Amino acid sequence: MDNFTYILADEDNGEAAVIDPSWDLEKIFGVIEKNGWKVKYIINTHTHFDHILGNQQIAAVTEAKIIQHKNSTQPNDIPVEDGQIISIGKMMIRIIHTPGHSKDSMSLVVNNELVFTGDTLFIGNCGRVDLPGSDSSELYDSLFGKIANLDDSMIIYPGHNYGSTQTSTIGQEKKTNYVLKARSRGDFLRFMASADE
């Protein structure tokens, strides 16, 4: 599935967050231990199994609190909503509710410099909308009403390694990602329906 798991850490005070822990937990623990970081939070961009598989094991070892969007039906410690701010050391993480791929999808804007988009936006593509709880119209609002309005220089870190590169920028994706081509809502819904066929 080519999942990405990320570790955000403030190197000054050692606080860290693990984003979307799935497989290869030994590697995650190794990086945390090597750097002496204290994991404060586990943050899920959404709660499909491949993004939460490692939650309980990491929480058990690190005592980190699990953060998910309030629409989640999975076990969590801190439900969050659109616009909420979470801090990891000096880093400020702003929650953007970006439903479409799932009802509880959210993107994480860090210090207004980078954004973790989960399965809402990939490099060169976007998340599926043929799964239970997915909705093309909601994805349209998330992509064009929220993600595309972020600063063009913001670096994108997606939930899967499906693109030609592992990262990109908002500006680059607006130029090259066919999903972000300017379309009416109706055209976008037809486009997504044809992609699912």
What are these regions (language model features)?
Residues 102-196:
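Metallo-beta-lactamase
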Residues 7, 85-110, 115:
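Core dinuclear metal-dependent hydrolase active-site scaffold
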Residues 8, 17-19, 116:
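Conserved catalytic cores of phosphodiester-cleaving nucleases, focusing on short active-site segments
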Residues 1-2, 13-16, 23-94, 175-179, ...:
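Active-site HxH/HxHxD metal-binding segment of metal-dependent hydrolases
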